[in-house]
């Protein structure tokens, strides 16, 4: 067993044993990629989210908080491009019928050979060639007989309505951003903000992804903390704002005790970048399984607002109060995954001192800041 795998298993065991995280629906055999947060996990997650809200919303006069609905008009997702571009490439083993994410399958194969390889952004034909030429085995049965890679939507579909024949298609939101974009005009009309300003929120999102063995790193539902920062591209350079938030994100996570040497920025390639982004960078943390994304920072330009103007017919332009000029602002988007911060802090804080397991957490995020224990003579680890 690799040392990294061993550390991951120790963290998973600690989380269940001490009431941080439990497997979802465990008494019924569980449901893959779902987890429930226990008493200590809830306290720690609340601390993380409260710290984020205080730092990026409460203490600032230029960012306004929102709490938008999980369900929105399906036209929102059509306009944003998610119904056509928010996909995952999957591949099936013909022998055992196991369905696997093609990108993750390829990357895990090369990682097992201690080779770095990114499959993101590869075409379906390229991924098929990589799987076949390397004879990549199925992680379940070991066979190398695969179907062709195919694209599947990451949006969870659902039906709204009581009468079966009148039910209509809808989606669970796949990101927080669209709820903020469609409320842009409401905030302009009610708050009269001046550029640059942001709209931020904390909320659950849902992604129909095929994952396995990643604990809370990648799940079917998770909580994001995110804001859209609007600015006039004719007045401010996007590079300057991008760099500003890049530093703010880095400084915030290191303020919670995460060492700088366990963090690195990684730029998305043109093939990897999302359909709405001109530039995306991930702040990676060195998890037990290696460096993986913890935060994301994207320059979404005016893509989303323009798409919603085109689809809805609403006027989502900003009018400069001094010049009277109307224009569509550009957007920089910092995104924070609370469950990944949670896992990063546990990974960084996990220590073994002899036979004792110690979790060294910054007091700002620790579930308990002070604990009083009785003196029990037969409990040497306490006495």
Name the predicted role of every residue range.
Residues 1-383:
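NTP/phosphate- and nucleic-acid-binding module
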